[in-house]
Design a protein with these regions (language model features):
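Class I SAM-dependent transferase core
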Residues: 27-74, 82, 112
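A short glycine-rich, Lys/Arg-flanked "PGG" loop and its adjoining helix->strand segment in the class I
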Residues: 88-92, 155-170
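Bacterial N-terminal signal peptides
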Residues: 10-22
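Core SAM-dependent methyltransferase catalytic element
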Residues: 209-224
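A short acidic, Gly/Pro-enriched loop at the edge of an enzyme's catalytic core
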Residues: 130-142
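Hydrophobic beta-strand segment of the Class I
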Residues: 73, 142-143
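Class I SAM-dependent methyltransferase SAM/SAH-binding core
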Residues: 74-132
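Conserved class I S-adenosyl-L-methionine
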Residues: 107, 170-197
Length: 224
């Protein structure tokens, strides 16, 4: 029995629609992460796990980025302020830390923590989606720890971070490896370092080096 031409066209349209519908999903899987899905403020306590100093190695990260006394630095997606206070201690009273987050609850938590611990060299910044609202050409280093997989428009965010760096400034991105180890997000929510490098290249940044010393994470350092 011959199939009517109209029915053939309808079947082909359904097949084509299914194929095109699958493309964004495949791209999402390839890119990794769940862009726009933010860390819930109700889980802030998880960011201050007692053993985090052991596997996060904040001093080595700051050393690798050249963060020292009087440095001006940014903590992007600062969350509970765990890294913020360590940066503030490192740069001292002559330095400045911009602690940025896009969630007001996080900014409030950072301000409480900074006040409780007596730091006067931290400025909390409520960023916009894909724009941390940092002053142009003013930062020696910018650090984004365990937050890259949450960013919705990564190239735009990286472009804005690049604008905030001084000519010789450095951007450090730390996020969890794809093997699923460690205390980070589920494997399907993680982002490949190759994707980060590709995004950074599109944003006009260059990979300087990759540091291998973290137990569960990769650490990429970029410059202009």
């Amino acid at each position: 029995m011959e199939i009517p031409a109209a029915l053939k066209r309808a079947a082909l349209a359904l097949i084509a629609g299914a194929i095109f519908a699958a493309v964004p999903h495949a791209q999402t899987q390839q890119q990794g992460g769940h862009p726009g899905r933010l860390f819930p403020p109700s889980d802030l306590g998880l960011l201050d796990a007692p053993d985090r100093d052991l596997w996060q190695r904040p001093d080595q990260i700051m050393d690798a980025l050249g963060i020292a006394d009087a440095s001006v630095v940014g903590d992007i997606g600062a969350g509970s302020g765990w890294f913020t206070i360590r940066l503030a201690r490192r740069v001292g009273p002559r330095g400045l830390v911009y602690a940025e987050d896009v969630q007001k609850e996080m900014i409030n938590a950072i301000q409480r923590r900074v006040g409780r611990e007596g730091f006067s060299n931290v400025k909390a910044v409520l960023g916009r989606e894909n724009d941390p609202r940092l002053p142009a050409s003013s930062l020696d280093a910018v650090l984004m720890v365990d937050a890259y997989h949450e960013v919705e428009d990564r190239v735009t965010m990286l472009s804005n971070l690049a604008k905030a760096l001084k000519p010789q400034g450095r951007l450090g991105i730390v996020d969890f490896r794809l093997d699923g180890t460690g205390p980070g997000p589920a494997p399907e929510e993680r982002v490949s370092p190759d994707v980060v490098v590709s995004d950074a290249t599109k944003a006009g940044l260059k990979l300087i080096r990759q540091e291998p010393f973290l137990q569960y994470q990769y650490f990429l350092i970029f410059g202009k």
